[in-house]
Amino acid sequence: MKLTFVLIVAVLVLAVCNFTVADKANNAEAPEQEKRACTPNGSYCNILSGKLNCCSGWCLALICAG
């Protein structure tokens, strides 16, 4: 009975530690490339590079719209 209790507590502690580490990993600082300023509306958006860089998130006919 005691062994079962100890095992349950150990599993719960490990689960909490795992969630804490995962949460910190999601909030990690982005690399320098990801910190670039976004492109304002009416400016050229480089959708061909595969990354959308418009502040609004919309690129229509290679122009940022929003």
UniProtKB/Swiss-Prot annotation:
Tissue-level expression: Expressed by the venom duct.
GO cellular component: extracellular region
Highest taxon above the source species: Eukaryota
Signal peptide extent: 1-22
Keywords: Disulfide bond, Knottin, Neurotoxin, Secreted, Signal, Toxin
Compartments in which it is found: Secreted
GO MF annotation terms: toxin activity
Keyword flag Signal: yes
Disulfide bonding pattern of the chain: C38-C55, C45-C59, C54-C64
Similarity comment text for this entry: Belongs to the conotoxin O1 superfamily.
Description of its domains: The cysteine framework is VI/VII (C-C-CC-C-C). The presence of a 'disulfide through disulfide knot' structurally defines this protein as a knottin.
Purpose of the protein: Probable neurotoxin.
Protein name (Swiss-Prot/TrEMBL): Conotoxin Cal6.38
Native organism: Californiconus californicus
